[in-house]
Amino acid sequence: VNIGDPVPALDPLTGLISVPANTPASNYTITYEICETLNPTNCDQAIATIGVIAAPIVAVDDAPAAVNGGTGNPSLINACTNDTLNGSPVNVADITATIVTPASNPNVALDPATGTVSVAPGTPAGTYTITYEICENLNPANCDQAIVTAVVNAGTIVADDDSVSGINGTSGGAGVLDVLPGDTLNGNPATLGGGGNVTMNVVTPAAP
């Protein structure tokens, strides 16, 4: 509790104690005195104790739909959307989020300021988890943790069949067929060599 924070107050005209909204969790005491109207010096004092608890905070695990690692997704999910404070969706202005355990690959990240989970293009396929914690700003010790599980799939790769005919076997020929045209990775042409997006291996060579 800090100076200037709301605190419970006793109305001496009614004897009722009120607790303002946004009062930090704590045990508060108010000492009051009652005096006889007929004999104003005939008085006694007592203490009223008011226990104020923090609002329930719940961070819920998230498992968004799988994402293509080749293309990524800058806003896969907002991890805070299903988290609640006092039974209502959290307002990021009312909580502070921190990363407890980051993903094993930094390409999969959670922005604590916004709750947004992103997957960068070129992320290897795998299942990545991020453990995060949200704490109420009003009561910084009022916290809960949750886990985001992001499944990253390999890119969509397509190799089309190819054919060529009429090759003179006696003279032969180099480069009689380029098999790459029509092959794609994530909808883009497959390319080899330095800066290429695929590699090529011979699975079954031609046989006599």
What would you call each of these model-derived segments?
Residues 1-20, 73-118, 173-208:
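Surface-exposed or secretory-pathway low-complexity segments enriched in glycine-proline
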Residues 2-52, 100-152, 204-208:
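Acidic, turn/loop-rich segments in luminal/extracellular domains of secretory-pathway
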Residues 27-33, 37-89, 127, 131-133, ...:
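Extracellular interdomain linkers/hinges and stalk-like, low-complexity segments
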